[in-house]
């Protein structure tokens, strides 16, 4: 299957599912899909994001192997389509973050919490990623708790409120 041609057809659940069934756990195919996700064509990248999520849900191993590359793009490319950023941070909540990337990713997640123009999903996922990193660095928990608390005061979105309250409760228990 030519992934670019398939994604160019339309932005649909049917096409994303077809790509997920084609890619499954095949690392080479997943690498090709990630290349589109991080590519210059924003429309194709946006369309690839859903397929990457479904491939991740099927098998997270290929995503974990690409994690350093995806984290680097998330940290250094402000031009990434919001769907691509959401896809990357969504899946980073679930995997173990490579040690070499934890500090920079934690800082970026905190920065996201303070940005009013970020989407609800990206903020909620960023809270979780930062919390997961705090499990390895307990000294960061107080800083994260304060950042979440401030975010709860300024952001009335149910998604941010729900995730924030749950994480503050977990941080208080620690």
Write out the residue ranges for each language-model feature.
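Alpha-helical scaffold domains
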Residues: 1-174
């Amino acid at each position: 299957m030519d992934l670019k041609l398939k994604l160019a057809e339309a932005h649909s659940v049917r096409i994303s599912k077809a790509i997920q069934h084609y890619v499954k756990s095949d690392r080479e195919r997943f690498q090709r899909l990630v290349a589109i996700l991080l590519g210059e064509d924003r429309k194709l990248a946006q369309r690839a994001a859903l397929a990457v999520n479904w491939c991740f849900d099927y098998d997270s191993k290929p995503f974990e192997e690409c994690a350093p590359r995806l984290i680097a793009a998330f940290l250094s490319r402000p031009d990434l389509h919001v769907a691509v950023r959401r896809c990357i941070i969504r899946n980073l909540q679930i995997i173990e973050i490579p040690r070499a990337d934890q500090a920079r990713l934690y800082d970026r997640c905190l920065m996201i919490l303070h940005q009013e123009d970020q989407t609800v999903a990206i903020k909620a996922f960023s809270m979780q990623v930062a919390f997961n990193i705090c499990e390895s660095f307990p000294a960061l928990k107080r800083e994260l708790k304060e950042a979440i608390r401030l975010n709860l005061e300024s952001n009335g979105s149910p998604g941010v409120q729900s995730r924030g309250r749950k994480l503050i409760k977990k941080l208080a228990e620690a």
